[in-house]
């Protein structure tokens, strides 16, 4: 007897729109431009920002362990003076920039900057403990350390995405009592200029997860350390936040210690044999990180990088006429200690001098941009509208409202006080910047484009690797041959005789 199959039938998933590469609808031209910033400098306090008496920021926090996120603004190529007006048809095409080369210049010497805490929660040296010492009421000590070593460069046309662990919420009706361990939640957010990098203590919100303010050094005790979410950016559908990235990290443990305090989760009794007297010491172990030696042999900066193929679907197209360049360089984190005389005495006294500390940074950004065209067919416009509608709005494309058949009123004496005001009182809505609430280092390159690539260091490197030659400027002029005079010809004739 025939019986139907009892196996489940799996239907194919519903088809979805396919994300295509920008190479399928963007046509690249042979026109390149060089753009560079001026020397970018930053000076501030490496541990915290110094406030004035009126609660205004006097000295900003500038640390070698902060992210530098540059928002580079580019000119609109559709309003750009082109060498060849017949390059594109403005009625059916639009121009966009493609980033093909970048070099991040870093000034200042190599060096390591220390950080620390005058009251760090350090109970014992658990690596070489001389004796079993119990915890007192306050065992905090003055400890300094160097951090994990990081070099990072991320390029995209949207801000980079970071991740960190923060305090989460329990499901109802569960409640969190005082002193209970808070639940953890992985949070994604934009990496902004000035955010702290992972220094070796984890990517987390130290302000809410370490309420003692003595577990980590001063510069991160009330801050959030973020780590780039490479997995999320690599899986992004359109690939706008991550064209490519360069990364180098290294760290080792310098000192081992344990934390003072009441153990919230004591060691189970079946894991050890009890002592004859006394209680167990703290079992919360931690370590101070170190990035070890810095050397010029392992530098990712002050070198050109050429973008041939991006890791995502966006192959370097700068949507919105902007790029976001994220930089981290802890190999130049030296802190400058300054000393000022408060009062002059004949003998040396520590109180006669005031000590200060500063950190300085120096950058130079250079780019090579390629001019590209997009033919605005119906399919391309529909695809771009689904990807980012603001792109078409910037190109002055909008939906035409349908013609209305209703009867409208038109007054003759518009300025008369006998009728109501006929003006539209609602002000025109300005275009809202989607990143206005975030903090970035804005670099305006709208007036710094040049087609003379051979006049700039990165431009000459680009011409060399691309096998191109610069346009000759000085051509040798050939002198015309001197015309023979009649007198000279007669002299030659007499000589022959």
From Swiss-Prot:
Pfam families membership: Late_protein_L1
GO cellular component, one term: T=7 icosahedral viral capsid
Cellular compartment(s): Virion; Host nucleus
Subunit structure of this chain's protein: Self-assembles into homopentamers. The capsid has an icosahedral symmetry and consists of 72 capsomers, with each capsomer being a pentamer of L1. Interacts with the minor capsid protein L2; this interaction is necessary for viral genome encapsidation. Interacts with protein E2; this interaction enhances E2-dependent replication and transcription activation.
HAMAP family: PPV_L1
Function: Forms an icosahedral capsid with a T=7 symmetry and a 50 nm diameter. The capsid is composed of 72 pentamers linked to each other by disulfide bonds and associated with L2 proteins. Binds to heparan sulfate proteoglycans on cell surface of basal layer keratinocytes to provide initial virion attachment. This binding mediates a conformational change in the virus capsid that facilitates efficient infection. The virion enters the host cell via endocytosis. During virus trafficking, L1 protein dissociates from the viral DNA and the genomic DNA is released to the host nucleus.
Protein's name according to its UniProt entry: Major capsid protein L1
Organism annotation: Human papillomavirus type 54
Phylogenetic classification of the source organism: Viruses, Monodnaviria, Shotokuvirae, Cossaviricota, Papovaviricetes
